[in-house]
Amino acid sequence: DELLEATKAITKNLNIEISDKNLNYLINNSKRDIKNIFRTLTQLEKESLERKKSIGLNLIKEIIQSS
């Protein structure tokens, strides 16, 4: 899937650590456009740094619901 590969490239470039399982969840449960996914990833990174926690499924769900 091109969207998955593009999203993996974004996470690599931004040094965001997220499992493939969680990345797939993000793609499958949010708007499937690269701008939205990029915005969500940057928000996930910000929240994970503020909370000093890794990016997990609960945080992904929270961010998706708030957007």
Q: Can you name each region flagged by the protein language model?
A:
Residues 1-4, 20, 34, 41:
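Amphipathic alpha-helical transducer elements in NTP-driven molecular machines
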Residues 3, 17-29:
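Short conserved motifs of the RecA-like P-loop NTPase core
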Residues 4-16:
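Conserved AAA+ ATPase "sensor/coupling" helix adjacent to the nucleotide-binding pocket
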Residues 24-28, 35-49:
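C-terminal helical "lid" of AAA+/P-loop NTPase domains
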Residues 33, 40, 56-60:
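Short, hydrophobic-biased amphipathic alpha-helical segments
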Residues 48-66:
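Conserved C-terminal helix/linker of AAA+ ATPases
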